[in-house]
A protein has these predicted regions:
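Specificity-determining recognition surfaces
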Residues: 1-27
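Membrane-targeting and insertion segments and their boundary/processing signals
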Residues: 1-4, 30-31, 76-80
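Alpha-helical structural elements
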Residues: 9-12, 31, 43, 60
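Compositionally biased, intrinsically disordered low-complexity regions enriched in proline and serine
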Residues: 15-18, 37, 49
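Alpha-helical scaffolds flanking conserved acidic
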Residues: 26-30, 102
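Covalent nucleotidyltransferase
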Residues: 34
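Glycine/small-residue-rich phosphate/adenosyl-binding loop
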Residues: 39-106
Length: 109
């Protein structure tokens, strides 16, 4: 339990990233952690889309990050962008109120 509490206390938001690829094994573990998150009524309304080609990642990096922070703090510089993105897709036909499910899954990542 202490390991979990220490992890929760020490986590933070990252906005600068190393340009190392993520192995398929690590990516699978991240997605498995998301899938193990609680789901209201066990409806499982979420799916995940992994974007990892450099061309597609560059499209996401054009988005504004941390809008409340000054640009120098919130926006990654060239060479600091993420090497992949994981999109969390909500199927509102399964559960129209699945925002909490998405938050729990993202928190597990």
């Amino acid at each position: 339990m202490n390991d979990l509490m220490n992890l929760l206390k020490e986590r933070r938001t990252y906005r600068r990233f190393c340009q190392k690829p993520i192995s398929e094994e690590i990516l699978a573990e991240i997605l498995t952690a998301a899938r193990y998150a609680s789901s209201a009524a066990n409806k499982q309304p979420l799916s995940y889309v992994v974007v990892k080609t450099p061309q597609r990642c560059r499209r996401f990096c054009r988005e504004k990050w941390a809008a409340y922070l000054p640009k120098k703090q919130g926006q990654p510089k060239a060479g600091e962008e993420p090497v992949l993105f994981i999109g969390v897709v909500q199927n509102l036909k399964i559960n129209p109120n699945c925002d909490t499910d998405a938050g729990l899954a993202i928190s597990n990542m």
